[in-house]
Amino acid sequence: MPSLTHSHLIGHRGARAEAPENTLGGFEYLRNLGINKVELDVHLSQDLELVVIHDTDTLRTTGTQLEVALTTAADLAQLNATYENKVLWSQAEPIPTLHQVLSVWENLEHIQIEIKPLESPEIRVVMAHELLKHCQKLNLSEKTTVITSSDYDFLRTSKEINPLPHGLVADHEIADIANPIEVAQSSGCDLLVLHYVLYTEDMAQACREANLPVSLWTVNDVETANLMVERGAASIITDKPRAFQEWIDQHPI
């Protein structure tokens, strides 16, 4: 009997395998599936806007080489972020700001806002304050929002000023040098966002004992996702939300 349900699904950068990642069109695609749970990435632009993009530069997604931190949000919005997209997409998709993404998302149920590793304590402080400002402006709630990062120094900095829940993003790079659960707890995190390969039965048991909910990334095989939910995962971050929905509909509990 399957354990995976629609409620477990979180769209990765929108729906990365089915629509251009981290774009307004991609997020609309996710909403049109009836999914209002999303993971996305933000960076600071030159003019301190929170822009939604995964990489520190624009080459992979737009075909144009610009450093996000050295480019204004207005100039980033002139680029078309469908360059890497593997599916047909009829319209251009500019790099959006976080405000543009969330100001039109009326029924948001859950969002993981991921901050990529930052270079210095000074930049961490700036990011933490700008993120807090934008979260307040957007009226983001602790019921819907988690600030996530693999940069645990940033998490500690942000946690000092931002009351929203925080989550540690952990993969082999962290797990090889430290216990992800201990790092999450020492960083004041409320969620462990774990690479699914690390979610063994022993890890699942340890997370339960630590009372630490787990969100797994990036799971694109439905059988694996179902197994992870059986082990206790609270949510599954996937590039293929529509494909997962179809499987769930064909395998009712």
Question: How should these model regions be labeled?
Answer:
Residues M1-I253:
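Phosphate-group recognition and catalysis centered on beta-loop-alpha active-site segments
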